């Protein structure tokens, strides 16, 4: 099961207060779409998620006690087990749709203010909208993304305004024949999940994200350390070659000034050490070791280029 499916499974198991059930139900039916069937004007809400179908059925039965509701299942492909679920509202259709502020013909996609006049109602509406038409990438993926899709621009703008109220700075983008309201920042996706009541999914998102960020930090440190080690090894090999050139030219390191002689011998004895570590061997600072090594490099360069040199001035 995908992470998004886990989130929706958690949300469909939440117990919703009766005062907020209508807001969630309004979003579920509005975002899934309602269609009229047959001469008896039965209303059908279709979804491919069995848990969401059960959620719509349960909320309808609990909110409107006397309505007649059924769930139908359509098997589209026996091999892939692809099924869709229809929630059929058979009685009190006009009453229910009017109470939920839903226009069955889609001519008025905006949500009536009375459905959203309390903070918890707006939370519930966002939850229903996500259940019906939302998705979220797994926190394991590099690109964090949460979105809600709607075919109506007016509804997309309402969703964006609702999300902004909870400090969720979403954006709207056109996609196909509709619009998506989306979040890209991981911390805001976490806040959205908490806002709509997906607490366990939110904690899982945070745990996975923290582990992923930690692995990335460790990898960056390892890469940086590896690069530094390679850089140190290249520099040390060059220094050893320069010291050997000096020995070949002078016949011995003994005629060098003591400070240069000591650093040269230390480098030959410890070819893999950093300059700071060579400084510790000689009981001098890193800058002191670096200064002496530069003097040896200067001498080796003069030898290579055939330039006259004075050892007493090094």
Swiss-Prot record:
This is Probable cell division protein WhiA. Keywords: Cell cycle, Cell division, DNA-binding. Involved in cell division and chromosome segregation. The keyword Cell division applies. One of its GO terms (biological process) is cell division. Transmembrane segments: none annotated. It holds the Pfam family HTH_WhiA. InterPro entries: Homing_endonucl (IPR027434), Intein_endonuc_central (IPR004042), Sporu_reg_WhiA_N_dom (IPR018478), Sporulation_regulator_WhiA (IPR003802), Sporulation_regulator_WhiA_C (IPR023054), WhiA_LAGLIDADG_dom (IPR039518).
